[in-house]
Amino acid sequence: MAAALVVAFSGLVGSAALAAPGSSAIITPVLGQLIGFTLPAGFEMQKEETSGDRYFRGAFLKGETTKNWTQMISISGAKNIDVDPAKSAQFFAANIANSIQKLCPDTFSVKPLGPTKIDNQDAFVAITSCGKVGQDQHSETGMTLTIKGASAIYTVQWAERTPANAENLTIDEGKWKDRLKQMVPFRICPVVAGEKPPYPSCK
């Protein structure tokens, strides 16, 4: 199992040379560190939202909005939480999954893909799914990379909404692993004083 995870995640911090046409490199300051990944073609980044020690920035398919979307890729960060050195990224990923489960306890599914390292920072990948959630009772599945940073917890997530399903959704592991590959390389880097976009120190 451990060997399989190494193979599955060996390219998460690899070169961007094989990035698909139309994709773009995203590197953005988030709560004291730079977070980077490849944004697949067809998505458009929106303005960041910050509130105290929380950060969020979403990207939607062209023509979609925060109120009406079928797919969303997002970066989030949370600071001033208990970043205990003894607690792994898997611990925080489990907390995220538990929060999602409360939204759809009867139709919740989860598929852990396992631990990895992003620039020597502890990270964990998991897929969660709700068969029915929200006022319109749509189905929603999300793949979340949780990174335990120096003083904050970060996530990069790809979520998809589909028509409601009364049962627990069967998670298509192959589909989501392919999407994960579309987002490499993931990066987490220190902020360099005075450095401006495109943040060459984090390439």
Question: For each of these PLM feature ranges, what is it?
Answer:
Residues 42-84:
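Secretory pathway targeting signatures of secreted, lumenal, and periplasmic proteins
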Residues 66-108:
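Mid-chain, structured segments of secreted extracytoplasmic proteins
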Residues 99-145:
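Signature of long, low-cysteine stretches enriched in small and polar/charged residues
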Residues 138-155, 159:
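A short, surface-exposed beta-strand/turn
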